[in-house]
Amino acid sequence: MVFIQKRIYVYINLMNLYQNKVLVAMPNMVDSFFSKSVVVITKETSETVEGIILNKPVSQVKLSSLSFEENETAQQEKILKKLISQSGRLFFGGPVDFSTASFLDVGSSKDRLSFDEIVIARDFSFFQKVLFGENKNQRLYFGKSVWGRGQLFEEIASGDWLLKDFDPQTINMEAKIMWEFLISSLGLETYTFIGEGGRS
């Protein structure tokens, strides 16, 4: 017979579980949007987790896979697609909500990242100014990534993502080397596994 002298209860705070974290896609990720992606968590509620992919220029994403909002005119959509194809400052933030973009001034992000959301149709002139202005530290992230809390937890548990403390200086890396650098820093190789995940 076992006599219990003291019972210790451990309470896990599930809120803020992803605060100041970054998701690094495992090499087995085959989802076309999230393969080799680095996602910084920007918002967390009791039901959902939101983030922005940091390392995918929109030029790498097939424009045919992007659906624009109905409130954008055909002319705006045509101009928008032209801007996307020409600018190196527009990044693909995720496959949700293409009516908005998240603005980031890299030069002011020394200790943390601070994103400002803009509505493209309403702030179209600002949108163009950022993409073609003189300040090369300014970036726009088109769309965002959204998961249900349970969905993201399951994807991490199944090995689709690695959860890592986020260093804001990561944003200064070239997009094409960011993912490989973080994977290597975690002691993993970039060979391919079999698997899938990351559906937002």
Task: Indicate residue ranges for each PLM-predicted region.
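N-terminal amphipathic/basic-hydrophobic helices that include classical n-h-c signal peptides
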Residues: M1-L14
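A short aromatic-anchored loop/beta-hairpin motif
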Residues: L14-Y141, S145-S200
